[in-house]
């Protein structure tokens, strides 16, 4: 479990949020490794010995640029956003793709199994809901804390199948800025091993009504060694599309 240092400046909203996750409150930073810091109105991920931190902020930086200047055209095609599909993001992480999908007007159910990452994402969504420019988009994201492969079958029984299951399993980041590389290094160190790819893809294909969309590096291997039905390829990223079991290609 992840340590969290709660500063005296932490707001009541932040204190309430972090109680929803199995984190270990500490009175001082650990001697090594990563930990969460709750201060003022934000939860951040820190690495002992480093000055920089990681927060989920949908109101500025790259998220703001993609929201105001466009972006996400390839992912929009991959999920066929003009059909207004429901999307379950089974590997939400820090929520970037969930936010892009929600900014396209889609309703997104996001799953994150790591308590610290889920806490960071929940905090980012909470703050986005308070910003007039992002509140409508953030309201379309429903975060579930837990393992998607375990939770999706039960959720299907109560909500029905989603049109799309979206997967973005961890892979080595290449040709990224120094800041992005450092952020991903923090993230990978915190999360450790990725989910079982075979189980994840199998469950996704059982769950999706129309398609499973998998984000990969342009030259990366197929997820779980399984070839997709078709692909959407960009300069550095591609989206592999798998059909649900029993579906015809098309």
Swiss-Prot record:
It catalyses: guanosine(1516) in 16S rRNA + S-adenosyl-L-methionine = N(2)-methylguanosine(1516) in 16S rRNA + S-adenosyl-L-homocysteine + H(+). HAMAP family: 16SrRNA_methyltr_J (MF_01523). Its main location: cytoplasm. Belongs to the methyltransferase superfamily. RsmJ family. The gene is rsmJ. Specifically methylates the guanosine in position 1516 of 16S rRNA. Its EC number is 2.1.1.242. GO terms for molecular function: rRNA (guanine-N2-)-methyltransferase activity. It is an enzyme of class 2 (transferase). Pfam families: SAM_MT. Keywords: Cytoplasm, Methyltransferase, rRNA processing, S-adenosyl-L-methionine, Transferase. The keyword Methyltransferase applies. It is found in: Cytoplasm. InterPro entries: 16SrRNA_methylTrfase_J, SAM-dependent_MTases_sf. GO terms for cellular component: cytoplasm. The keyword Cytoplasm applies. S-adenosyl-L-methionine binds at residues 96-97, 168. This is Ribosomal RNA small subunit methyltransferase J. The lineage of its organism: Bacteria, Pseudomonadati, Pseudomonadota, Betaproteobacteria, Neisseriales.
């Amino acid at each position: 479990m992840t340590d969290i240092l709660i500063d005296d400046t932490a707001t009541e909203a932040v204190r309430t949020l972090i109680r929803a996750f199995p984190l270990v409150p500490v009175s001082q930073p650990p001697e090594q490794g990563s930990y969460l810091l709750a201060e003022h109105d934000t939860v951040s991920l820190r690495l002992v010995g480093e000055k920089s931190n990681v927060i989920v902020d949908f109101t500025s930086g790259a998220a703001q640029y993609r929201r105001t200047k466009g972006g996400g055209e390839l992912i929009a095609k991959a999920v066929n956003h003009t059909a207004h599909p429901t999307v379950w993001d089974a590997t939400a992480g820090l929520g970037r793709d969930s936010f892009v999908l929600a900014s396209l007007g889609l309703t997104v159910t996001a799953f994150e199994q790591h308590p610290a990452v889920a806490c960071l994402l929940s905090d980012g969504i909470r703050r986005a809901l308070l910003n007039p420019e992002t509140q409508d988009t953030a309201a379309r994201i429903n975060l579930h804390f837990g393992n998607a492969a375990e939770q999706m079958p039960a959720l299907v029984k109560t909500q029905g199948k989603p049109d799309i299951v979206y997967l973005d399993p961890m892979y080595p980041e290449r040709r990224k800025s120094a800041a992005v590389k450092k952020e991903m290094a923090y993230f990978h160190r915190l999360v450790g091993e990725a989910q079982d790819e075979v189980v994840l893809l199998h469950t996704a294909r059982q769950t999706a009504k129309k398609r499973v969309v998998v984000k990969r590096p342009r030259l990366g291997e197929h997820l779980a060694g399984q070839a997709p039905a078709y692909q959407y390829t960009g300069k550095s990223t591609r989206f592999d599309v798998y059909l649900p079991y029993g579906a015809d290609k098309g």
